[in-house]
A protein has these predicted regions:
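Contiguous segments within soluble domain cores/interaction surfaces
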Residues: 2-144
Length: 144
């Protein structure tokens, strides 16, 4: 049975020229000024462990705060000689209908291998008030 070694939500993930998994800007919260909110780009970086050369079928699932599934992506993976497979799932223009705690899951069949929470929070925008006033002129004849 496959296992998840790690699962990170981040701004960007990729494999470099020598096979190092580069994971940039991990996060677990998104602040949005209004809902529905669209997040321009994010990436799931993960390492799946199985047997060397094993064909693995895993599914990514994004769940809404009410439990309904918002998105699903199925992936076929072949484990390397060490039994591991590094994966990057890039998500673009993901729409979040409401604030709350979303769930990111990696499944094999119906079994949840790993899950993470992603909180969507309504951002408080600063109130627009009158512009600041310059300081009052000082009396030049007055001693300090």
């Amino acid at each position: 049975m496959a296992q998840v070694d790690y699962l990170h939500l981040c701004d960007l993930s990729f494999m470099d020229q020598v096979g190092k998994h580069c994971i940039i800007g991990m996060f677990d919260i998104i602040h949005a000024p209004a809902f529905p909110a669209t997040h321009p780009t994010m990436s799931l970086a993960m390492r799946i462990l199985g047997q060397p050369g094993e064909a693995l079928q895993v599914t990514f699932e994004l769940g809404r705060p009410n439990g309904n599934v918002l998105a699903t992506v199925a992936m076929d993976v072949v484990a390397g000689a060490d039994g591991g497979a590094n994966l990057n799932l890039n998500l673009s223009q993901t729409q979040f209908p409401e604030p709350g705690r979303y769930t990111l899951k990696i499944l094999s069949g119906k079994e949840v291998l790993a899950s993470r929470s992603l909180r969507l929070v309504k951002m408080d925008l600063p109130q627009q008030g009158p512009p600041p006033q310059p300081p009052a002129p000082q009396d030049k004849n007055k001693l300090h």
